[in-house]
UniProtKB/Swiss-Prot annotation:
Gene3D superfamilies, alphabetized: Bira Bifunctional Protein, Domain 2, Serine-tRNA synthetase, tRNA binding domain
Catalytic activity: tRNA(Ser) + L-serine + ATP = L-seryl-tRNA(Ser) + AMP + diphosphate + H(+); tRNA(Sec) + L-serine + ATP = L-seryl-tRNA(Sec) + AMP + diphosphate + H(+)
Swiss-Prot/TrEMBL domain comment: Consists of two distinct domains, a catalytic core and a N-terminal extension that is involved in tRNA binding.
Name the record gives this protein: Serine--tRNA ligase
Function field: Catalyzes the attachment of serine to tRNA(Ser). Is also able to aminoacylate tRNA(Sec) with serine, to form the misacylated tRNA L-seryl-tRNA(Sec), which will be further converted into selenocysteinyl-tRNA(Sec).
HAMAP family: Ser_tRNA_synth_type1 (MF_00176)
InterPro entries: aa-tRNA-synt_IIb, aa-tRNA-synth_II, aa-tRNA-synth_II/BPL/LPL, Ser-tRNA-ligase_type_1, Ser-tRNA-synth_1_N, SerRS_1_N_sf, SerRS_core, tRNA-bd_arm
Subunit note: Homodimer. The tRNA molecule binds across the dimer.
Main location: cytoplasm
Length: 430
């Protein structure tokens, strides 16, 4: 969440910046609540001071033999007024907090203004889309033809729409992609591989910003035990990885911290009805290799370039054409200050499709989580900056490999970097 100073000292300017994201901040309501908060805060402090003064007077009156009952009655009355004022202040602060928790991050100064994805800026393209001298098939037709290596019909019987069963060479390639990504990020990019829970509590989801605003996008767990804490399946490993330092204070020397994890991700895809209903592009369950950085504030913009570069390296080693896009203000995610999307070329769609989103959240998540660090010699800790990105979405990487490496007979050439993970197999055939 944003620093309270933006709502107390820079409200109009903050509202203008948020408007570039398509977010309408209710300035009048915030101003009214802030005025009420100040008035009740002053009244609370005055009542506390008066009560303390009367309490001291009781001791003096008692020592001099005076009747202290009137003073006792006055202190009791002041105590009741003070309790009421504190409760009123608590209600106002909670209402302010509820509003602030629903406000997105402010865009960084270099982020282009725009309403939607049509106004994103292409930064670069890498590789040249391959020309095929035969009719290109999409990943669904290719996967189903390879000994039913990709089976959506059976998955629908087992669970429902937007799930898949993979078999044989397709399943092995999916696993190979995961292993290749993890090895690359740990061996060459310096990430610490981390195994995390696939279920998280509400504090974790508040910390990274999924709650309270995006609860409908999650799958929530219903347990039989009455004392079970509310939990949800993770929508991304960003949630548990970033929350590793919730309510923690790191030493300056520990930063930057770089974590990677391979997990399944679970999303309800609320609001995406009718979009990408065919194939692996938009599933309720999908695998992803996540990259998370925790850094000092002055490091975060450079860290974003590095993190994005690490995701790009995966695509380059797979020799998959892609483009890098700087998102405009209106297309960024809730907690992001700056985001790059990597979009891989899919021949069957004749289009670039998102395969990674890399974001600098600055101190937006850290403030919610109270994830802090202490500089050497400093007394007070500071908020970290957090970053995250896909390195990559495994299912979409599989889609890209199948479509870009297809041959006329429906077989798939295995990218060279994946062959060591597939027992030396060079071609997937039916």
């Amino acid at each position: 969440m944003l620093d309270a100073k933006y709502f107390r000292e820079e409200l109009d300017q903050t509202a203008k910046k948020l408007a570039t994201r398509g977010f309408d901040l209710d300035v009048a309501k915030l101003q009214k609540l802030e005025e009420q908060r100040k008035e009740v805060q002053v009244r609370t402090e005055q009542l506390q001071a008066e009560r303390n003064s009367r309490s001291k007077a009781i001791g003096k009156a008692k020592a001099s033999g005076e009747d202290i009952q009137p003073l006792l009655d006055a202190v009791s009355d002041l105590g009741e007024q003070l309790d009421n004022a504190k409760e009123e202040l608590k209600v106002i602060q909670q209402e302010l907090n509820d509003i602030i928790m629903g406000v997105p991050n402010l865009p960084a100064d270099e982020v282009p203004e725009g309403a939607d994805e049509d106004e994103n800026q292409e930064v670069l393209t890498w590789g040249k889309p391959k020309s095929f001298d035969f009719e290109v098939k999409d990943h669904v037709d290719l996967g189903e033809a390879l000994a039913k290596g990709m089976d959506f019909e059976t998955a629908a019987k087992l669970t429902g729409a937007r799930f898949v069963v993979m078999r044989g060479g397709i399943a092995r390639m999916h696993r190979a992609l995961t292993q290749f990504m993890l090895d690359l990020h740990t061996d060459e990019h310096g990430y610490l591989e981390t195994y995390v829970p696939y279920m998280v509590n509400q504090d974790s989801l508040y910390g990274t910003g999924q709650l309270p605003k995006f609860g409908k996008d999650l799958f929530h767990i219903e347990g039989e035990s009455q004392d079970q804490i509310p939990m949800s399946l993770i929508p991304t490993a960003e949630v548990p990885l970033t929350n590793l330092y919730r309510d923690e204070i790191a030493d300056e020397e520990e930063l930057p911290l770089k974590f990677t994890a391979h997990t399944p991700c679970f999303r309800s895809e609320a609001g995406s009805h009718g979009r990408d209903t065919r194939g692996l592009i938009r599933q309720h369950q999908f695998d992803k290799v996540e990259l998370v950085w925790l850094v000092k504030p002055e490091q975060s913009m450079d860290a974003l370039e590095q993190l994005t570069g690490h995701a790009e390296t995966v695509l380059q080693k797979l020799e998959l054409p892609y483009r890098k896009v700087l998102l405009c203000t209106g297309d960024m995610g809730f907690g992001a200050a700056k985001t790059y999307d990597l979009e891989v070329w899919l021949p069957a769609q004749e289009a670039y499709r998102e395969i990674s989103s890399c974001s600098n959240m600055q101190d937006f998540q850290a403030r919610r989580m109270q994830a802090r660090f202490r500089r050497k010699g400093a007394k007070k800790p500071e908020l970290m900056h957090t970053l995250n990105g896909s390195g990559l979405a495994v299912g979409r990487a599989l889609v890209a490999v199948l479509e870009n490496y297809q041959q006329e007979d429906g077989s798939i050439v295995v990218p060279e970097v994946l062959r060591p993970y597939m027992g030396g197999v060079e071609v997937l055939k039916a």
